[in-house]
Each structure stands twice: as C-alpha cells, then as structure tokens.
C-alpha cells in the first residue's frame, strides 16, 4: 500500500489497466529478511532490488528519513547473509506529484530525478558497489510501438472481419494492453482527476506510450543521475537496464529488423557510453518480415502474458548487442 505512488493511485481507479490491486502483495517490505535468507539458502550471491521513489520523496522536496533507513536495513541484511546488494533507483513507479507536473514528458523530470538520486546516494552510497538508475529505460518508447501495432492490428481485423488471438502486441510487463485500448478514453478522464491534471494533459507515467522527446528525457535523467553518483562515488558501478526482444528476420525482413534494433537498442548507445554495465531483460523473440512483425508461430508455447516462451532469446540478444 504505497499510497504516494502513481501505480497505487491507478490501481484504485474504476477504469484501470491493472488486473487487480497489489495490496500487500507478498509483503516483502516487512518480510525482506526471510526472503533474503531463502535467496542465500538457494545459492544466490546477489540481490537486485528497488528503492521506491514515492516512499523516499512522497512530496516534492520533502524526503522521508525513516524510509531511507528501511533500505539501509535491507542492504545490511544482504551483507549479513552474503548477498551483494544492487539497488535500482526507478522501476516503473513514480511519485504522484511527478505525474501532476507532467510526468516523464516534462522537462523538469531530469532535475527531479537527479535530486532524488542525490538524496539516496548521499545516504546509502557508502554501502553499495552497484547501482542501476532506471529499469527497462526503453519501456515508454517500446510501449508506443506496441500500442501502434495493436491499433493497426485491430483496424486490419475489422477490415477483414476476422479475429486474431495474438500478434506482437504484448508488452513485457503486467499491463493488459487490450484492456488499455478499450478503456483508454474513460481511463484518461478519470486519471486527470486523480492526478489533478489540466484539461488535455494525459498521464505520462512510465507505463504510458512515450514520445521521442520523452525517450530523450529518460536518457537525460539517467545521465544526470550517473554523473551525480560518479561525482560522489567515482568507483561506483553504474548502469541501466533495457527490455530487448530477440528480433529474428524472416526472408526479406532484414531491413525491418535493423530498424527495430535501432529503435530498441542502438540509438541509446551515446547515452550509455560512459556506463559501467548494461542490464538486459529479454522475455521472448519477435519474428520480422518485410512489412513488420509477425504473429507468434502456430503451436508455440505461450506464457501467461501471451508471448512466445523462448528462453534462447536471452542468449541471442546478448550475442547481438
């Protein structure tokens, strides 16, 4: 019940894209020591977890020292049981006040994120060796592509008077894209009230389709955070993670595949050139023909999220990059 989070606020909405409210989930916030013990017993030697911005800075410029102490305790617990803590500073959710200011399409996001990062690093930096600034930093641009594909697919189905069970319209997170498209208008109207947005402004959270400018702002925020961390702790290992499909070209699809790799990965290279590492999250492959992405192959194993179960995609993505 992270009540200052944009995700929590949207879970409570009548017209929501979330399948169900998270409530206490597995209550890791209070049971982290039990969970860390199980990780150690299972042979893990590191634990990547997130610091929740909305808990740390519930109101703009007002930081909660008790929450930063909570995360200090989690880090100490990792050390106690032999796990290397790796902190992620942003994992999808943001404070509600960030969204009210325009979210991840507002130029102010760069300075706001930097200020939050400085607070965290000045309190926790001496206890850490690895920091991931932003999880799946390409998510908003990837979301825009998925939504565009879904719209085109829906238009084609109406034109052909056919139905389709799946195409490459699945996003690699727990959001129901089909439901989002169907509820979009009502959701935006309700969300404007929830976040006190002016007429015409949409909710630009990390789960929303991003513009090219918004994509650039994420990279600016990452670079500002990285530089602030390095200024204070030069030896800190800093990077981000990207959600990458394993794009595979069908005959004639080579040019389209290269365009997708440019969009999903290569255009970020200048922004991450000074990073110490890159994290890769891969969930599936995507078959690409001359006209774009193809549906999941008939007979393929499908995950609960609706995309093809294809473990080899991680290896092939790493080889590609």
Residue ranges, per PLM feature:
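Non-catalytic scaffold segments within catalytic domains of secreted glycoside hydrolases
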Residues: 1-30, 36, 40-45, 56-319
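Juxtamembrane transmembrane-helix termini
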Residues: 49-54
């Amino acid at each position: 019940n992270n009540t200052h989070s944009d995700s929590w606020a949207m879970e409570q909405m009548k017209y929501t894209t979330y399948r169900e409210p998270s409530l206490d989930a597995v209550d890791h916030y209070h049971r982290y020591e039990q969970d860390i013990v199980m990780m150690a017993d299972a042979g893990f030697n590191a634990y990547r977890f997130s610091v929740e911005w909305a808990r740390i800075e519930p109101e703009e410029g007002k930081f909660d020292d008790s929450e930063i102490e909570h995360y200090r305790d989690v880090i100490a617990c990792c050390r106690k049981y032999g796990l290397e803590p790796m902190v992620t500073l942003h994992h999808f959710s943001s404070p509600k006040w960030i969204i009210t200011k325009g979210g991840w399409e507002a130029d102010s996001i760069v300075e706001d994120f930097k200020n939050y990062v400085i607070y965290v690093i000045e309190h926790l930096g001496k206890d850490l060796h690895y920091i991931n600034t932003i999880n799946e930093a390409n998510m908003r641009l990837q979301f825009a592509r998925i939504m565009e594909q879904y719209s085109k697919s829906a238009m084609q189905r109406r034109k052909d008077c056919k139905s389709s069970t799946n195409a490459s319209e699945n996003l690699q997170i727990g959001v129901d894209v089909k439901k989002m498209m169907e509820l979009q208008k009502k959701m935006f109207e309700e969300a404007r009230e929830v976040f006190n947005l002016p007429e015409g402004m949409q909710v630009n959270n990390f789960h929303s389709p991003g513009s090219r400018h918004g994509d650039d702002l994420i990279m600016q925020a990452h670079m500002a955070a990285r530089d602030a961390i390095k200024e204070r702790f030069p030896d800190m290992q800093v990077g981000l993670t990207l959600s990458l499909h394993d794009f595979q070209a069908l005959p004639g699809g080579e040019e389209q595949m290269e365009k997708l790799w440019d969009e999903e990965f290569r255009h970020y290279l200048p922004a991450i050139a000074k990073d110490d590492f890159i994290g890769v999250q891969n969930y599936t492959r995507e078959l690409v023909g001359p006209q774009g992405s193809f549906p999941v192959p008939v007979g393929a194993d499908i995950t609960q999220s609706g995309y093809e179960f294809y473990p080899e995609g991680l290896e092939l993505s790493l080889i590609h990059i």
